Amino acid sequence: MIYIGLTGWGDHDSIYPPKTASQKKLQAYSSHFPIVELDASFYAIQPARNNEKWVKETPETFQFIVKAYQGMTGHQRGEIPFDSKEEMFDAFKVSLTPYLHSNKLAMVLFQFPPWFDCKKENVAYLRWCKHQMGDIPCALEFRNRSWFSPPFYEQTLSFMKAEGWIHSVCDEPQIGEGSVPTVLRATDENKTLVRFHGRNKQGWMKPDGGKNWREVRYLYRYNQQELEDWKKHLNELQQQCKDVFVLFNNNSGGDAADNGKQMLELLDIEYSGLAPRQLDLF
């Protein structure tokens, strides 16, 4: 099965009924898509009340891709707010309890930063991370091209498969070492993740000193031909694993939801079990 969704649920104005309150947006979102990426967990390990609330607000078959906390992936500047890395991982795993108990956890996404390159100590850290996470399904996304350079390409994929990492396949601007190529290879027989980041080369490189780079980094709208090409790629990936989870992250200009809907039409997919959709009668 191919599951289409977006990163976050709070900034997709084209899918909400008029005047939808922020606390009602997840419910509205889940009437359109069966999966979502939770990125609040990247900035802080979420308290139980938040996770329980989000689980309760979504349909029984809804699935979350929970982004790993930034201290776990090396994005955090300075000291982590825990006594040890083990304590940090334990706290994060406890936060996943509502998703695990409700069968709503698709996977945890470990997205590593551009400076996390292919070298022995980083390979060892990936192995350690996966050991800490135990049987929890985890996806791995790189932002450094060295992992897929000719000397390491097959070794990286073999390592991911041997260690039980789900491959997070990326569509993103192809610029230097801070981006990775699109590698259409599943490393887990059950799940593959695909994330669409757009192809805005200028935005990806932090123009103008990087002051407002987050506002333009994902400013991109995929055209019909690009989506049709990806229809073929997604079908190819589905031949390699049971389920493919697709996330549109190109939302600096509000394009993610529309592109997600276009992909649903191209694939001729209609999901059952979505939340009831509110009718706009006037």
Swiss-Prot record:
InterPro entries for this protein: DUF72, UPF0759_sf
Pfam families in alphabetical order: DUF72
Family in the record: Belongs to the UPF0759 family.
Protein name: UPF0759 protein YunF
Provenance organism: Bacillus subtilis (strain 168)
